């Protein structure tokens, strides 16, 4: 099954793995909702939802850049609504947005841990929950979960999970 005409709602699609997935789908002629927080350039982070949209359209897809913080339920619902209205539905959700901390458990402050939990667990749940009504309307729906890297050394383990 190709992706021509299929609609993907991808969180964290302004850079990295999310953008790579979007570009690959765009080459097949997919519609891509770029659901990410970065609307203005940041010297520490490459790409914005708008630069991603330009790349997607150059690759052959249709793009909808949306400013979305996956922690904000109303924003997520609104972005899903906009996506379905623009493209006629949603076929695939890619939960890719994440926060990580490249520190040990002992060195990770609780504020950072809470942020990771809010984005990686709650945000993924919120997007999936509110996407289901759209996914139920299509023949072959999918939800793809992308997880941040895990570190399994129990003494110096990273706290992401």
Regions found by a protein language model. Name each.
Residues 128-129:
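A short, exposed helix-loop element centered on a Lys and neighboring polar residues
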Residues 91-92:
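Short SAM/SAH-binding signature in class I
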């Amino acid at each position: 099954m190709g992706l021509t005409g299929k609609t993907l709602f991808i969180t964290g699609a302004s850079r990295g793995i999310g953008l790579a997935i979007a570009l690959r789908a765009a080459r097949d002629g997919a519609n891509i909702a770029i659901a990410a927080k970065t609307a203005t350039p940041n010297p520490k982070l490459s790409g914005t939802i708008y630069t991603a949209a330009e790349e997607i359209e150059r690759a052959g897809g249709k793009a909808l850049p949306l400013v979305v913080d996956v922690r904000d339920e109303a924003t997520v619902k609104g972005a899903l609504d906009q996506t379905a209205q623009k493209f006629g539905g949603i076929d695939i959700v890619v939960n890719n947005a994440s926060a990580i901390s490249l520190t040990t458990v002992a060195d990770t402050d609780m504020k950072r841990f809470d942020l990771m939990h809010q984005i990686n667990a709650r945000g993924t749940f919120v997007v999936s929950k509110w996407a289901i009504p759209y996914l139920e309307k299509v023949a072959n729906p999918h939800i793809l979960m992308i997880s941040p890297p895990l570190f399994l050394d129990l003494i110096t383990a990273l706290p992401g999970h």
